[in-house]
Amino acid sequence: MAKNTKLWGGRFEGTVEDWVERFGASISFDQKLAKFDVIGSLAHVQMLGQTGILSLEESEKIQVGLKELLEELEAGQLDFDIANEDIHMNMEVLLTEKIGPLAGKLHTARSRNDQVATDMHLYLKEQLGYVLDKLAHLKGVLLDLAENHVATIMPGYTHLQHAQPISFAYHLMAYYNMFQRDSERFEFNQKHTDLCPLGAAALAGTTFPIDRQLSSDLLEFKQPYTNSLDAVSDRDFILEFLSNASILMMHMSRFCEEMINWCSFEYQFITLSDTFTTGSSIMPQKKNPDMAELIRGKTGRVYGHLFGLLTVMKSLPLAYNKDLQEDKEGMFDTVETILNSLDVLAGMLSSLQVNKEKMQESTEKDFSNATELADYLAGKGLPFREAHEVVGRLVLDSIKSAKNLQDWTLEELQTYHSLITEDIYVYLQPKTAVQRRNSLGGTGFDQVEYQIAVAKKANEAKK
């Protein structure tokens, strides 16, 4: 029987067949962690040297080899072998080819369990910075767009029915606030990602006199995990990221859904740049909002990665299990998906054209000013419920007569209630309706300008 030549092969008499090896290998995707694997190894071997577990000479020789590997990796000169299973074994084999048997000492006081957890913490810590940067850019684009459209009037909707006129900037600021909370969630995620598993070993720590705080400091983590079993067993920091990413994608998807509607022939509120649209292979007139649709579609993809890892984790006993190999691809894909989606959404918003006249016109041919009349009557002392009933009858009669509220004469309006006077026509104007809603958080122009000013100050402070 052939001898098992794996780095872990001493306990085995037989070998793993090639097709089984392919099933179990992860190098096809976990090679994304190569840089972080080397960085983690550099910190580990420095710690081994400084604590006397290895001699300083041994530590320095291993560091030289690792740094050469890092240079070759960055130059695209490393080839990985599926026979070595994963990125950790591949890097150790490559290091052995470079510096000989001394490479075997690198794994002293370390397991692949804490090694992979460290790699993933380092990877996600870096990516969270990119996500937050792109979110900040998107929020800046939103603020610039909102600042230019405080006085642009559009219908506000409930149940996809015209509800009340609002400022377009006000609508944009609603999304700004959603994206701001997304930023805050990712910032909190950073706290849980900024923990160092290195030195936890397989699950129970190690008998070697390691210095986990030193390893943590060298890798610029805030602190080590306080429980080694926890450090290698859980992936909640990834689940938290996937959850946050799912909420972010949901917010982007809702925004894209609205833009898809707004650029349709029925709305014509906005025109998307040619850069973010495509045509039809059969219908020459088409200009399809494909990029917005793709963001909407990719939202389900990110949801799937969250539910996939939740399902993987739900019944895992402590500590490490091979199931955890399934924690990476969804994380990698989610990072790529949200970074690209943030770029595309920011690009769409910075280049779209707003059709102000069409938005304004749509508020003049509906009954979104009905609440104004009800509030007008209530402001004159009529109980709101009575005012609501009066205006409801007037709306019904207007529909039957094919009229808008402002089309009725004063004498006709007064047949519905005597409290109505000549000034009602000012109140029924969409712009007046918007201006008057100056309660905190309202759509009044002063309130929207205040919201934008506060948001710009906060956004600038984060840069």
UniProtKB/Swiss-Prot annotation:
Pfam families on file: ASL_C2, Lyase_1
GO cellular component labels: cytosol
The organism's place on the tree of life at top rank: Bacteria
InterPro entries: Arg_succ_lyase_C, Argininosuccinate_lyase, Fumarase/histidase_N, Fumarate_lyase_CS, Fumarate_lyase_fam, Fumarate_lyase_N, L-Aspartase-like
SUPFAM superfamilies on file: L-aspartase-like
GO biological process terms on file: arginine biosynthetic process via ornithine; L-arginine biosynthetic process
GO MF, one example: argininosuccinate lyase activity
Keyword Calcium: no
Keyword Transmembrane helix: no
Subcellular location: Cytoplasm
Enzyme Commission code(s) on record: 4.3.2.1
Entry keywords, A to Z: Amino-acid biosynthesis, Arginine biosynthesis, Cytoplasm, Lyase
Catalytic activity reported: 2-(N(omega)-L-arginino)succinate = fumarate + L-arginine
Main location per the UniProt record: cytoplasm
Pathway assigned to this chain's UniProt record: Amino-acid biosynthesis; L-arginine biosynthesis; L-arginine from L-ornithine and carbamoyl phosphate: step 3/3
HAMAP family with a match to the protein in the record: Arg_succ_lyase (MF_00006)
Similarity comment: Belongs to the lyase 1 family. Argininosuccinate lyase subfamily.
Protein name per the record: Argininosuccinate lyase
Organism expressing this protein natively: Streptococcus pneumoniae (strain JJA)
Lineage: Bacteria, Bacillati, Bacillota, Bacilli, Lactobacillales
Gene coding for it: argH
